[in-house]
């Protein structure tokens, strides 16, 4: 019995370490998938890339990544629900970004940009984030 009580703290620490490791791996895999999808989308030269979207990536410096990703998912949803544009890729991008974002956020941007510019800037943000991990 004494050995069991001695093993419990060690097992708890081991469990905590492995869950942190798995979470880190999932995060890196999500970032890779987002960047891959953005590479595919930004390589396209169809008319959808010229659509005007809210420039939510031009947020103040003190805006958290989770808030920026939440706003980006809002823009993506508006595109694929109102336009028949690369829906499969935009939905996948939305799903992956949502896993890294706040659940709710407000989007009231006045500035606009093209979808292509939006996706290019989002790709740069994600590549920078990936290089830090």
Curated annotation (Swiss-Prot):
In terms of PROSITE patterns, this protein maps to:
INTERLEUKIN_4_13 (PS00838)
Which residues does UniProt assign to the signal peptide? 1-24
Q: Which SMART domains match?
A: IL4_13
Q: Does the keyword Disulfide bond apply?
A: yes
Q: Show the SUPFAM superfamilies listed in the entry.
A: 4-helical cytokines
Q: Which UniProt keywords apply?
A: B-cell activation, Cytokine, Disulfide bond, Glycoprotein, Growth factor, Secreted, Signal
This chain is glycosylated at 28, 45, 62, 84, 96, 102
Could you name the Gene Ontology cellular component terms for this entry?
extracellular space
Please provide the Gene Ontology terms (biological process) for this protein: B cell activation; immune response; interleukin-4-mediated signaling pathway; negative regulation of inflammatory response; positive regulation of DNA-templated transcription; positive regulation of macroautophagy; regulation of immune response
GO molecular function terms here? cytokine activity; growth factor activity; interleukin-4 receptor binding
Membrane-spanning parts: none
Q: List the disulfide bonds.
A: 48-85, 70-113
What is the annotated localization of this protein?
Answer: Secreted
What does the UniProt function comment say about this protein? Participates in at least several B-cell activation processes as well as of other cell types. It is a costimulator of DNA-synthesis. It induces the expression of class II MHC molecules on resting B-cells. It enhances both secretion and cell surface expression of IgE and IgG1. It also regulates the expression of the low affinity Fc receptor for IgE (CD23) on both lymphocytes and monocytes. Positively regulates IL31RA expression in macrophages. Stimulates autophagy in dendritic cells by interfering with mTORC1 signaling and through the induction of RUFY4.
The family annotation for this protein states: Belongs to the IL-4/IL-13 family.
Report what the protein is called.
Interleukin-4
Q: Gene for this protein? A: IL4
